[in-house]
């Protein structure tokens, strides 16, 4: 029997969702960007959310509330402003909130007809969160010029909270950025050389934190979970010697294990270490054994990246020996920031009682942390509560409606042949050229068109029963007809139906497949004001009937041009949903691949000759350790190929990827064997194409020629330049012309203006190059 401990286990979390339970921040941001509210009103929304979130943390019994996790756009961008590190094109010498938004979103064209491009945006490790990439040049200087962190600490202290600030560490900040001057790089510039200057700014930050009476700072160095180059790994020792102060440092890691850097970590001038035992449970024993005796160990036991209820009973059993070994040096926390979790399960009033007992959102995870800590401290009521809390998970393990025999039979029948198309690309390309009759530089879009308020209201009315099915179908067909008419007017070559019926590219499929659970308010931030509402995989996945065929077939009936069928790929559906934790991700991907394979067959039978299977998430699913990546890529590629392999040779399979760095996965991208791949390249000025050029990628490519995430409307000349840059790296006969991504979040005015310039640019170059060829 466990006796009550005399040493209390300290509790905290690594961060909390910023957007609000009802996405209050999103709506305030967008009103501000549209000029509908003043900045003071936006600031008031942020303050109210922070105070609410701190109150929730305090009320749950956490020993610390976390400050510094709030961001107006992205926490890496917030760090850039804190350090006075703003791209010159946006830097007026006095960085403010509008500066931050310009860096993240770009600056619209002004009276001179010019605009300033946003900084690059890319995935935050292997999550679906995006951050704004810091830009580094050899003459960069850093100075603490943005007071948000200090203001929010003071704000929390004024409310009476015990505050633990969070700060992105200097090495991770540098690693997450990029050198932007090719000439400097050629001359040997490496952003790591900026570390001494950067550390001076960090010293100033810690001086200010000390003056605020801060005892502990959570300093995030997630890159320690990577297999770092030696120069980077070796830089940690000096960096932490330089920035040590009277403020205690909790060196914080997540998303994978750090035992491979343990010798270096234990020599750092810090006061404690946080590890993620949800992502990497096997590291725990080695780290407990090697931990300096004066350090605290913060164990990230409650999974911050999924919605499943923590198995507190088993966690208590696993961590009890750690508590006995470490005593009051043990802290309990979330595995990573709860940014990646929805806010509050209590809002989900439409879920069944059984289903509710399976889940915990961010607010509920606060109590999981404190309940587990109480149990580890020997509180008998807490130990009993942990046992009871885990019972729904035990009951689920044996539930017959979770594991379905028919699905298991199809999985067992998968063979290598199931993932191969009948003929090689070189042969398929000839069949497709004859069948499709497309011109040089064919123009298309990625799939979605603007989701107007009418579309959203009609979908909502249908979902709530205020609009009957017949009227809903009529309304959606009207929007499809409008989208087709606009595309015909623009003279695009390959059309799409616009996806008016889809709220989200993953949620739509989840709602139409068995084995998923949708939520009403399960929103998580993707970037800026963009939120997504991932469905939850709760059981084996089946398709009862075709999902996209009727809409696509209707759209095709309105035009003589080719209409693309639009599917979301198996790896992306997996990556953008909350997966089951009782089976492997590979098995879930295979289940999805089989149902999508059936959908491809049905689209083809309905007369659709081009089918796009989007896989924007394929890279973000990579394990962050390179040594673990091959196994993932093998099954991810297989899943895509199973989906596509039912297509005939004359059916053209497209795939789309956005915000991906391809160098490290180019062989796997080629192995997908898609006939056409469209990619995000405009923000990086086509630099992503270098990977395809170096690899001699054999199939067709559509590099994005304008950034749909920015309100800037690209000029025809700008697009011509990008296409010509692309044509220097990819044979022109294999080039497509398209935007970077779907156009769902844009309005029709800017969409049509941008697409008009895109089509004009393609036609001008088509005419020029065909004349030259003649």
Swiss-Prot record:
5-methyltetrahydropteroyltri-L-glutamate binds at residues 23-26, 123, 530-531, 576, 620. InterPro entries: Cbl-indep_Met_Synth_N, Cobalamin-indep_Met_synthase, Met_Synth_C/arc, UROD/MetE-like_sf. Signal peptide: none annotated. Binds 1 zinc ion per subunit. Zn(2+) binds at residues 656, 658, 680, 741. Gene3D superfamilies: 3.20.20.210. It catalyses: 5-methyltetrahydropteroyltri-L-glutamate + L-homocysteine = tetrahydropteroyltri-L-glutamate + L-methionine. L-methionine binds at residues 446-448, 499, 614. GO terms for molecular function: 5-methyltetrahydropteroyltriglutamate-homocysteine S-methyltransferase activity; zinc ion binding. The active site is at 709 (proton donor). Pfam families: Meth_synt_1, Meth_synt_2. Transmembrane segments: none annotated. GO terms for biological process: methionine biosynthetic process; methylation. L-homocysteine binds at residues 446-448, 499, 614. HAMAP family: Meth_synth. Belongs to the vitamin-B12 independent methionine synthase family. Catalyzes the transfer of a methyl group from 5-methyltetrahydrofolate to homocysteine resulting in methionine formation. This is 5-methyltetrahydropteroyltriglutamate--homocysteine methyltransferase. It comes from Aliivibrio fischeri (strain ATCC 700601 / ES114) (Vibrio fischeri).
């Amino acid at each position: 029997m466990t006796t009550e401990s005399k040493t209390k286990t300290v509790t905290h979390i690594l961060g909390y969702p910023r957007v609000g339970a009802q996405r209050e921040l999103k709506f305030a941001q967008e009103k501000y960007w549209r000029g509908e509210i003043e900045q003071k009103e936006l600031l008031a929304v942020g303050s109210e959310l922070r105070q609410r979130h701190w109150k929730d943390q305090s009320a749950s019994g956490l020993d610390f509330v976390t400050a510094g996790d709030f961001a107006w756009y992205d926490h890496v961008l917030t760090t850039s402003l804190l350090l006075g590190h703003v791209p010159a094109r946006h830097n007026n010498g006095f960085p403010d909130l509008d500066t931050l938004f310009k860096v993240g979103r770009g600056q619209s064209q002004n009276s001179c007809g010019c605009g300033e491009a946003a900084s690059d945006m890319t995935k935050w490790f292997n999550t679906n969160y995006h951050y704004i990439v810091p830009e580094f040049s050899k003459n960069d200087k850093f100075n603490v010029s943005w007071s948000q962190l200090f203001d929010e600490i003071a704000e929390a202290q004024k409310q009476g909270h015990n505050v633990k600030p969070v700060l992105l560490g200097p090495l991770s900040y540098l690693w997450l950025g990029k050198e932007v001057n090719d000439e400097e790089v050629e001359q040997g510039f490496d952003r790591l050389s900026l570390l001494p200057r950067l550390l001076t700014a960090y010293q100033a930050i810690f001086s200010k934190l000390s003056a605020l009476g801060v005892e502990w700072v959570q300093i995030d160095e997630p890159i320690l979970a990577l297999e770092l180059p030696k120069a980077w790994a070796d830089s940690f020792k000096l960096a932490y010697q330089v920035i040590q102060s009277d403020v205690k440092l909790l060196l914080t890691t997540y998303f994978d294990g750090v035992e491979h850097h343990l010798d270096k970590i234990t020599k750092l001038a810090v006061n404690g270490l946080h590890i993620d035992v949800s992502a990497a449970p096997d590291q725990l024993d080695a780290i407990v054994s090697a931990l300096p005796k004066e350090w605290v160990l913060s164990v990230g036991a409650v999974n911050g990246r999924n919605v499943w209820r923590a198995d507190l009973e088993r966690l208590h059993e696993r961590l009890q020996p750690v508590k006995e070994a470490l005593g009051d040096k043990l802290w309990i926390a979330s595995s990573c920031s709860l940014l990646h979790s929805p806010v509050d399960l209590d809002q989900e009033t439409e879920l069944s009682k059984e289903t509710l007992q399976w889940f915990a959102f961010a607010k509920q995870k606060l109590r999981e942390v404190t309940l587990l800590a109480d149990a580890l401290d020997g509180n008998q009521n807490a130990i009993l509560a942990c046992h009871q809390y885990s019972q729904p998970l035990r009951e689920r393990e044996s539930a017959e409606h979770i594991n379905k025999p028919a699905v298991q039979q199809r999985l067992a029948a998968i063979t290598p042949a199931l993932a191969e198309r009948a003929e090689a690309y070189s042969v398929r390309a000839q069949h497709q050229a004859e069948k499709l009759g497309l011109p040089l530089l064919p123009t298309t879009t990625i799939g979605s068109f603007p989701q107007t308020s009418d579309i959203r209201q009609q979908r909502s009315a249908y979902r709530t029963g205020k609009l009957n099915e017949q009227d809903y179908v009529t309304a959606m067909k009207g929007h499809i007809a409008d989208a087709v008419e606009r595309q015909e007017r623009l003279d695009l070559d390959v059309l799409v139906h616009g996806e008016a019926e889809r709220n989200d590219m993953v949620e739509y499929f989840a709602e139409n497949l068995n084995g998923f659970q949708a939520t009403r308010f399960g929103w998580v931030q993707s970037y800026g004001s963009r939120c997504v509402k991932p469905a939850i995989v709760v059981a084996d996945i089946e398709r009862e009937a075709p999902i996209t065929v009727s809409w696509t077939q209707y759209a095709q009936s309105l035009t003589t041009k080719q209409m693309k069928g639009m599917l979301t790929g198996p790896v992306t559906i997996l990556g953008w949903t909350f997966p089951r934790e009782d089976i492997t991700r590979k098995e879930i991907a295979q289940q999805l691949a089989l149902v999508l394979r059936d959908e491809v067959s049905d689209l083809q039978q309905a007369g659709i000759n081009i089918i796009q299977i989007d896989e924007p998430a394929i890279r973000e699913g990579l394990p962050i350790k390179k040594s673990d990546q091959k196994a993932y890529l093998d099954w991810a590629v297989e899943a895509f190929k199973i989906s596509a392999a039912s297509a005939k040779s004359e059916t053209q399979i497209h795939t789309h990827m956005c915000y991906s760095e391809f160098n490290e996965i180019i062989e796997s991208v080629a192995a997908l064997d898609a006939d056409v791949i469209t990619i995000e390249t405009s923000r990086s000025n086509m630099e992503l194409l270098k990977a395809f050029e170096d690899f001699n990628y054999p199939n067709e490519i559509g590099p994005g020629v304008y950034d749909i995430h920015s309100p800037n409307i690209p000029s025809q000349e700008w697009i011509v330049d990008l296409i010509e840059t692309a044509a220097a790296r990819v044979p022109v006969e294999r080039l497509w012309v398209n935007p970077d991504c779907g156009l769902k979040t844009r309005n029709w005015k800017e969409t049509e203006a941008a697409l008009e310039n895109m089509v004009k640019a393609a036609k001008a170059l088509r005419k020029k190059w065909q004349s030259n060829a003649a």
